[in-house]
Amino acid sequence: MQEDTVNDLKMIQEWFETNRVRETGIVENVQKQPASPERDEMLEICKGNIEEFSMMIQLVASIIEREK
């Protein structure tokens, strides 16, 4: 049971990592666009998402350590 839980948590962690990388790519593309209020808003949203994904990755990593 514990091994299944750890595997599930690792899958969740990978999902957060994949989305963090995706959001980082969006930020890189958006930064190339001309400055505008919409661009700035998109950057703030994506940067907030990256921060949240990073926190979730750390949280899941700590849960995985506890489950081992």
Roles of regions detected by a PLM:
Residues 29-40:
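Charged, low-complexity interaction regions
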Residues 16, 20, 39, 53-54:
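Generic alpha-helix initiation/capping and coil-helix boundary signal
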Residues 4, 8, 41-59:
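Alpha-helical oligomerization interfaces
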Residues 1-29, 59-65:
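N-terminal acidic leader/helix
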Residues 1, 36, 45:
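Residue-level detector of functional hotspots within protein domains
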